[in-house]
């Protein structure tokens, strides 16, 4: 488990040569569907760009706290930081 200010990443090694991601953005944390979907798109894009270093891992990313959509670069950067941590330690 890797954590940042607003995201949590669960990682499990798997015996395949690809990486997968699951996203949890609960309605309890972010009420508006438009904002939940925007956050998921940002995290998916970060995953797509860094998929090579996560080969052989199942990842689940969870939004821990509400965030402002104006902070989309911060969400993206936190996701990338967590992917980097996971790739280095596993």
Predicted features along the sequence, with ranges:
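Positively charged, solvent-exposed patches that mediate nucleic-acid binding
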Residues: 1-90
């Amino acid at each position: 488990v890797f954590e940042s200010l607003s995201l949590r990443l669960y990682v499990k090694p798997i015996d395949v040569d690809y990486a997968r991601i699951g996203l949890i953005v609960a309605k309890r944390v972010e009420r508006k569907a438009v904002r939940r979907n925007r956050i998921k798109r940002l995290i998916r894009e970060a995953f797509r760009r860094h998929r090579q270093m996560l080969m052989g891992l199942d990842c689940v990313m969870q939004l821990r706290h509400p965030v402002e959509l104006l902070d989309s670069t911060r969400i993206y950067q936190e996701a990338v930081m967590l992917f980097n941590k996971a790739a280095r330690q596993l």
